[in-house]
Amino acid sequence: MKAYQREFIEFALEKQVLKFGEFTLKSGRKSPYFFNAGLFNTGRDLARLGRFYAAALADSGIEFDVLFGPAYKGIPIATTTAVALADHHDIDTPYCFNRKEAKDHGEGGNLVGSALEGRIMLVDDVITAGTAIRESMEIIQANGADLAGVLVAIDRQEKGKGELSAIQEVERDFACAVISIVSLSDLITFLEEKGDTAEHLDAVKAYRAQYGI
């Protein structure tokens, strides 16, 4: 695990974005941890969040032309990531996001920001069922662009309804890399290093044994 990944987990815990306990997911599964990126909700939080997304992008080595943030949660993520890439990596990247409802006046259309062209890096908070990615792919393809990859905050590394995770299904269906700032494996490593979280560690390991990929 790299330093920025460890720092991201600490940041998420500090902001209570990442919590350990017992949580019922939409799928009905009882999870020993929960991640709610909506709690990164101040200017300082967003600035820090962008730096972690930018670090993961730089670390990945994936080449892309435009950042795309799907409405709604992806919009501030794309914006802060673009700022962080410029400020901390000297990479001036165009960014774009979509409207849920197309605008019929002014500039019109359902896209805001740069043109959606070339190789697109999609940024979002998490992938659960992959629905948002599929909707975004329709927009990307309609503009004649290609999906270079997807970056999310956390990869839960757990099976969906079949044997694959939602992330693995996206990788299979769209032939692109899906990367994350951290994964469930990183969370487990973090808990092992902490040494004072045996209760949470055992619960997370048991969850991975049951649902992990």
UniProtKB/Swiss-Prot annotation:
Its EC number is 2.4.2.10. The keyword Magnesium applies. Orotate binds at residues 34-35, 128, 156. Gene3D superfamilies: 3.40.50.2020. SUPFAM superfamilies: PRTase-like. GO terms for molecular function: magnesium ion binding; orotate phosphoribosyltransferase activity. Keywords: Glycosyltransferase, Magnesium, Pyrimidine biosynthesis, Transferase. Its cofactor is Mg(2+). The keyword GTP-binding does not apply. 5-phospho-alpha-D-ribose 1-diphosphate binds at residues 26, 72-73, 99-100, 103, 105, 124-132. Coiled coil: none annotated. GO terms for biological process: 'de novo' pyrimidine nucleobase biosynthetic process; 'de novo' UMP biosynthetic process; pyrimidine ribonucleoside biosynthetic process. PROSITE patterns: PUR_PYR_PR_TRANSFER. Catalyzes the transfer of a ribosyl phosphate group from 5-phosphoribose 1-diphosphate to orotate, leading to the formation of orotidine monophosphate (OMP). PANTHER family: OROTATE PHOSPHORIBOSYLTRANSFERASE 1-RELATED. Homodimer. Belongs to the purine/pyrimidine phosphoribosyltransferase family. PyrE subfamily. This is Orotate phosphoribosyltransferase.
